[in-house]
Amino acid sequence: MDFKKEETLRRGPWLEEEDERLVKVISLLGERRWDSLAIVSGLKRSGKSCRLRWMNYLNPTLKRGPMSQEEERIIFQLHALWGNKWSKIARRLPGRTDNEIKNYWRTHYRKKQEAQNYGKLFEWRGNTGEELLHKYKETEITRTKTTSQEHGFVEVVSMESGKEANGGVGGRESFGVMKSPYENRISDWISEISTDQSEANLSEDHSSNSCSENNINIGTWWFQETRDFEEFSCSLWS
């Protein structure tokens, strides 16, 4: 019998006529015995449905509109103290229902907390990034020095010390020039080329001198032979 009665109860959205009838019954009998009120009102609704409809929508003492700053502060403090006990928190906020407070918390404060957590996370990442950048610069400086030492780079005196040593006139060493083994090999190679070229020039000069001497010797021999021939001819004619 009760099962059939429950099947005949109306469910779903409330109609305007149902709201008006429930308000009239509650104004006459008060907020009590919701199952009895549901039967007396003639509404095909359960007592729980009538109670929730009254408390969340039809009660004239309900506050409409957004939460005030004072209400936000109370919700924040009580939630930190009691957690998700929304009915207990609603008793401290007249005109606000537990369901309204719960929805407000989920849609506002949770987003605020997530935004704060994200802000802290980005701040932590930013600080870590600066620290990592600083460590990276230190590592690069150390690696550069190590590489210079491994390849035999020799650091010459700095510009300031070069100016002091040269009386304010800085040569090539005054500007901190670095010489590597590769540069030394290039210099040696250029020197070898210059030496070979000089030897080649000397060889050419020697060859030229030899040719000149040979030419002189040939000329002298030809002159002597011609002179002897002339003297011989004169002796024949005389």
Swiss-Prot record:
Domain HTH myb-type: from-to ranges: 6-58, 59-113
Keyword Disulfide bond: no
Keyword Transcription regulation listed: yes
Induction summary: Accumulates in etiolated seedlings in dark conditions.
GO cellular component entries: nucleus
Biological-process GO terms, alphabetical: response to absence of light
Compartmental location: Nucleus
CDD domains reported in the protein's UniProt record: SANT
UniProt keyword list: DNA-binding, Nucleus, Repeat, Transcription, Transcription regulation
Signal peptide residue numbers: none
Record-linked InterPro entries: EOBI/EOBII-like_plant, Homeodomain-like_sf, Myb_dom, SANT/Myb
An example Gene Ontology molecular-function term: sequence-specific DNA binding
Pfam hit, one: Myb_DNA-binding
Residue ranges for the DNA-binding region feature of this UniProt entry: 34-58, 86-109
Principal subcellular localisation of the protein: nucleus
Chain span(s) of sequence motif Nuclear localization signal: 31-38
PANTHER family assigned to the protein according to its UniProt record, in alphabetical order: MYB TRANSCRIPTION FACTOR-RELATED-RELATED, TRANSCRIPTION FACTOR MYB27
Protein's name in the database: Transcription factor MYB27
Organism: Arabidopsis thaliana (Mouse-ear cress)
Lineage: Eukaryota, Viridiplantae, Streptophyta, Embryophyta, Tracheophyta
